[in-house]
Amino acid sequence: MASRFSVFIDTIVDPRISVLRDRNVVKWIYGDLSFLTTRKKEHEDAWGRKVLNRPAKQWSGQLGEAIGKEVCILLYDNVKIPERIQRFQLDLETDTYMIEVKTQTYLTSGTAAEKIPAVSFKYADVPRLTGKTLQIMCIAGAEEQSKKCGLLPGPAQTFQKQNYVTFFKENQVEFVGLSNLLKALQPSSLDLSNE
């Protein structure tokens, strides 16, 4: 999938698209860590800091927001950083969505991804306040973990969990894996379903 998406992104001439041109970033989005010399947290962290030219410890959120912004530029109209809504500062806004980006590395242990479903509760009033659907965009390890816990479609999404996801959607809150958004970007001639 990563190689086909990279071929597609090479056809885009928009100068605002830069992070998605990095083939290793695209591999990382899809969970392909073959570009790391060793599959260790320290190597993933060093790579992420290098991509952002950011020596500070925290990098995945910033990289995820950059990826999310570029994908939104390709998918939606009028992408911008939204004004603060009451006490909330969401990551992105388009003509139809308020977007909160959730990103996680692949080689970090812990329970951070288990908190992603709570984002829907935290921002439950955003659709009413803005008239726009809240889209919670799960990127990289956050997407993988959201599939494993049943928040996104996959074998772990039981009937009961699907009911919760449906309830969120009925209330203008949707969880979306970045890989699904990337599929929507590509021409049908680049069908990725067989990869």
PLM feature segments, named:
Residues 66, 70, 120, 159-162:
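Residue-level marker for well-ordered alpha-helical positions
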Residues 103-156:
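Catalytic cores of nucleic-acid endonucleases
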Residues 75-83:
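Short secondary-structure junctions
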Residues 88:
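Beta-rich catalytic cores
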Residues 92-105:
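Conserved catalytic cores of phosphodiester-cleaving nucleases, focusing on short active-site segments
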Residues 135-195:
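Domain-level recognition of nuclease-like catalytic cores that cleave nucleotide substrates
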Residues 1-76:
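Interdomain/boundary linker segments immediately adjacent to catalytic/signaling cores
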Residues 68-76, 123-130, 168:
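Hydrophobic, Leu/Ile/Phe/Ala-enriched alpha-helical segments that form helix-helix packing faces
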